[in-house]
């Protein structure tokens, strides 16, 4: 954004309704005081993130083992139930801040923040004059064309498939089997260990793509690597606790620290 030329239309469009989208909206609104910011999303409004302590136990280190040992259907059920701890949600305080900003602008009669709810982008055309974005409101079918200086896509991501990375080593199964220690299952003639940092949500739970369990996971992988070394005498097993114990009262596994 800092390398952009001078704004021609004084308008931004942000697509998405998660934490990243809301933070981008807040940033653009604050750093470009003359510009409009239009947030386009298909829901009616932002959904608050569930940061309640009971729900956030799904990020606890010991929960990883429980989920891994559970039936696949149960893991999927819990994943769907607790998506609101991480996916397509916004911190409640930020929701309140943006709502208050929009409300003040409505009262003052000088609007710069627009929430285009139940809407979708149907066309984007870029030329030398900027970007023309067509937005369709699903409630009444109305289509507006917004001429803007930049479009920010905060629509999330899909994890990259492992197949292209593994090449000929890729198994025929759609989801490669992953052990509890994050080691990818390989044929007997493959002696090297392949460990996954991320990409294990379907087997190890929601915490796989977050920082909540990163230190513990690194310790578990290190222990597994050392245990599999063919040294004589055997390498001493590393206890995860020896890597640095976190006080019991620490909230590293909760959403506040994510």
Q: PLM ranges: what are they?
A:
Residues 1-19, 23-258:
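Flavin (primarily FAD) cofactor-binding/catalytic cores of flavoenzymes
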């Amino acid at each position: 954004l800092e390398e952009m030329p001078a704004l021609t239309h004084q308008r931004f469009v942000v697509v998405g309704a998660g934490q990243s989208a809301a933070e981008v909206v807040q940033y653009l609104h604050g750093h470009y005081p003359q510009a409009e910011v239009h947030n386009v999303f298909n829901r009616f409004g932002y959904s608050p993130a569930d940061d309640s302590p009971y729900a956030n136990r799904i990020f606890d280190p010991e929960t990883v083992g429980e989920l891994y040992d559970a039936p696949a259907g149960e893991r999927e059920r819990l994943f769907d139930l607790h998506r609101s701890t991480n996916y397509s949600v916004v911190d409640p305080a930020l929701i309140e801040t943006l709502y208050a900003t929009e409300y003040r602008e409505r009262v003052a009669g000088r609007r710069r923040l627009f929430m285009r709810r139940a809407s979708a982008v149907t066309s984007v055309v870029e030329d030398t004059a900027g970007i023309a974005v067509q937005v369709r409101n699903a409630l009444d079918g109305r289509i507006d064309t917004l001429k803007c200086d930049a479009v920010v896509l905060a629509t999330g991501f899909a994890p990259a498939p492992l197949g292209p990375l593994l090449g000929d080593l890729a198994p025929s199964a759609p989801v490669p089997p992953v052990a509890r220690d994050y080691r990818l299952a390989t044929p007997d003639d493959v002696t090297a260990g392949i460990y996954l940092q991320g990409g294990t949500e379907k087997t190890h739970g929601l915490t796989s793509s977050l920082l909540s369990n990163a230190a513990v996971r690194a310790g578990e992988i290190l222990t597994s690597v050392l245990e599999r070394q063919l040294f004589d005498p055997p390498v001493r097993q590393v206890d995860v606790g020896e890597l640095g114990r976190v006080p019991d009262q620490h909230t590293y596994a909760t959403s506040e620290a994510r």
